[in-house]
Amino acid sequence: MSALATAEPWDLVAVNYAAESLPYLEAFAREALRLAALPPRPRIADIAAGPGTLSLLAAADGARVSAIDLSPRMVDEFRARSGAGGMAGAVDVRVGDGQQLPFETAAYDGAFSMFGLMFFPDRAAGLREMKRVLKPGGRAVVASWIPFDGPFSALFQAASEIVPGLPAGGGFALSDEESIVREMSEAGLANVAVHRVAQELKAPSFDAFWNSMERTNAPLVLLKHRVGAERWQTMGPKIRERVAATLGEGPLTLGRGAFLGIGIA
């Protein structure tokens, strides 16, 4: 099982992830909501919801949202953000397993998993649960990362050598269009289509980029936590050097691509 399928790395990054990564990730969430083309004031299930990136955008536009995440600290961040935004009444968020949803059957217009289901130990179960909770004709949307190389590949390769269960070289499940169509179709979703979406990650310098990664990148933060502060003083600069050799000192503009798979219940 992937280390990223457990609560530990997401608990470790929760506070900084919510503070620093939201503007970048919200762009993918907005596109997912646009492509889903749900009716006005829809009911939405947000699975592996993190700090509420998609949920709170949807709620601000009138949706009623049921959300779940396996990380207690991510759920804490979600609740804090929904309260601060005056949307606590529009969202119900709880800690739980996306492979066994505590949601009623055939009740939702849309079910979303933004960069979460790809880490599930049993993706088929997660997709079947998405299908189960959707009304007939409801939309399931699954986001996953297009394989990346360069600096991110070097980072993941270095991390995977220390922490078993991390993807080596930056490869995740559902990282090609064929597997997305196959797995969503096998779960009973119809007319599955896959869209490519690209966003840019900008940093004023490599130092700024690296410092943010040390706070928000779940594999890197988990690695740092597992090896301990003393070993990290030696290991961290070596990994940084490998990544910097690819990127240079900046300013940086890094393109990241994602797949959005959409199927009909």
Residues of each region from the PLM?
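Class I SAM-dependent methyltransferase SAM/SAH-binding core
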Residues: 43-101, 125
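A short SAM/SAH-binding and catalytic strip from SAM-dependent methyltransferases
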Residues: 109-123, 146
